[in-house]
Amino acid sequence: GHSSYALEDVTARYIFGKKLEGAEAVDALVKIFQEYLRVKEQDTLYKNLELPVAKVLAQMEFNGIEPDMELLDQLAEDMSFRIKKLEKTAIEQAGEDFNLKSPKQLGVVLFEHLGLPVIKKTKTGYSTDVKVLEELEGKHPLISTILEHRKLAKLQSTYIDGLKPLQNPKTGRIHTRFQQTVTVTGRLSSADPNMQNIPTRTEEGKQIRKVFVPGEGYDYLMSCDYSQVELRILACIAKDEVMLEGFKNDQDVHARTAAEVFGVPLEEVTAQMRSRAKAVNFGIVYGISDFGLSQQIKVSRSEAAGYIENYFARYTGVKQYMDGIVELARKQGYVTTLLGRRRYLPEIMHSNFNLRSFAERTAINTPIQGTAADIMKNAMVK
């Protein structure tokens, strides 16, 4: 099929009238794809960035990372105890026995027996997804218990029970797979396990991070990252003077945005203002709507629209960039990153509003997110 990357399927799609197998098929495909890359002006990116990065990733996969299995066992025991305790509490709060993992049973308990307001229905009954539960939080103590139970159960299945079988019996290490060709923006992803998405904000997440330790002969694990890389890229490609000035003066970018959006001096910015400005900053990068922002920061749609309007009034360069890049995408059918990676947007001229809007948001975001990936990969090679 068209979505399959198995050698026989790719060969069938690109080589007509010949039955080629194994190395012969690979050799023929290489010639076809090299020409395809040249025509699309992607050959330099491929040779100078993606191939060298592949070697770095191979070495990283080979090296792996060492887990402290004793700590993992200890966390597993603690997590199981806490989950069982929450299950007992939930049954007491509900006043009846039910399976917390069954959305159907939970729906009956919440909306029929406890009489909580129905937020959303699905084909099979009441919706009990996270958004629904968060909206109901505060209306009954059971809701908070269910949310905590779900959080811990996910951590348990993904990171505690999930990590044990992934330890290599020969090396004693966990060897994740880095995926270089999965995301359309050029970003790397990771699987088995996903080492790029281990939670850090919660206390439980921090404990899981402690499971990964320096191997024998090493004293510490080193972590490197770019500070606010996507917002810095936005400031640069949009040539926005206000945002550039903030970065040049090493200001807290979210506090600076709060001062601009709320019209207060920097020193008078509150924690709530900064939090909302942070949502605006990252939301703008992803082309967020007033409705999307209102849902995220729990304010009215008109208030969210006011924040976005104030943002564009102060950061005029960002607004000009967004309008300009969408127009460019309409003209040429694609957008590019700093190092020339292309993302084609066939839906940018679509008559369907939702498809067209998604393509427009993609046109805005790809040069930012993709350039961040280019910079990160370049640093890895160097």
PLM regions and their residue ranges:
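Conserved catalytic alpha/beta cores of large enzymes that bind or transform nucleotide phosphates
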Residues: 209-234, 245-278
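Conserved, non-catalytic sequence blocks in retroelement Pol enzymes and Pol-derived host proteins
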Residues: 100, 246-248, 368
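Flexible glycine/proline-rich, aromatic-decorated loop/lid segments
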Residues: 200-205, 251-255, 350-352
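A small-molecule sensor/coupling module
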Residues: 237
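Short amphipathic beta-strand starts and helix->beta connectors
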Residues: 203-208, 380-382
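Conserved catalytic core of nucleic-acid polymerases
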Residues: 62, 168-171, 175-176, 181-183, ...
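Ordered, soluble secondary-structure elements with a strong preference for glycine-centered loop motifs
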Residues: 1, 228, 366-370
